[in-house]
């Protein structure tokens, strides 16, 4: 395997700039106050990508000369499973019309079809190689990390975000002990930051000059610490894996830079982590955490909370689906935050098993198809993280993780003749 397998891939600066915005405004759904839901940043990016695909790349995708067989096969399967789930949910919604109340599943399945099944296909044509996508994800995540850190330590930044942008979170910008970002917050933001750590890890191993990416990894991981434990813990596990891969496949320069910078940087990081999870009142801005400890919010245990949430038993309704991912139908109630249980209540047990089995099988096949060993291992770790994280919250129906995973898999083996000029 080529030690610096990313050095020979080109990433022109002009193209990289709009690719960064393309990635940032899809992964993080930015919505200023007064802007309707149909015009959030994620949906605007989808409209642009869809229009460009139809007008420029549809003929190429359908032509006999298009020889990226894995991409074509996987994208069609993604669209197929998206259509099946959406059509089934449409039928269930019609059958249960007026019989229950809660948060409907129909919109989630429609957006999965559009923002995962179709958008992953559209996005393939916006990047010439895997390095362009990795760099776009890296810089987009660094930008978000800077915003998170500024939000945590600067009240002025927090007020600015509070006055100008909507956020999907349990608490507003001014009432949270955690750092918030632009267009995302809490555990979803933590997972999205982790999504940026995976491309950063690949860049650290695959580029001969990796010092900048090591600093970037530390900054993103620190932001994840301020946001939520899920992304931070996954980032630490990914760090351990990355260090192992560097010492197996990396050069002496890569090993030295990671050892020196990493030791100093992560010593500081873990020192801050120890303070962050402690009750030390004297440490500057961390006093904001204690306000939540006084009312017991900070000490809640995630596992205990999930156990206390109502889950409907298996019956005919939950076998076929109720059309609500959280709510009450014919006396059955589910209020769970777990992605698997929300799908079970909304789509039904049968379709949920089929959906996750088919999707995870497709993800596993795409990981095995990757030729580069380092990328294969790190995207395999991302796959396992997605499976694990879905047990906490419905991250798959927030679309960022499937977008990053599938697009990285597609671009890893993109044929040279399919490059876009």
Protein language model features and the residues they cover:
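N-terminal signal-anchor transmembrane segment
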Residues: 1-64, 88-92, 386-388, 401-403
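Hydrophobic transmembrane alpha-helices and their immediate junctions
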Residues: 76, 237, 241-249, 256, ...
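Aromatic-anchored transmembrane helix interface
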Residues: 77-90, 98-123, 132, 136, ...
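Alpha-helical transmembrane segments of multi-pass inner-membrane proteins
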Residues: 134-159, 182-228, 232-246
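A membrane-periplasm/extracellular boundary helix in multi-pass inner-membrane enzymes
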Residues: 244-294, 314-316
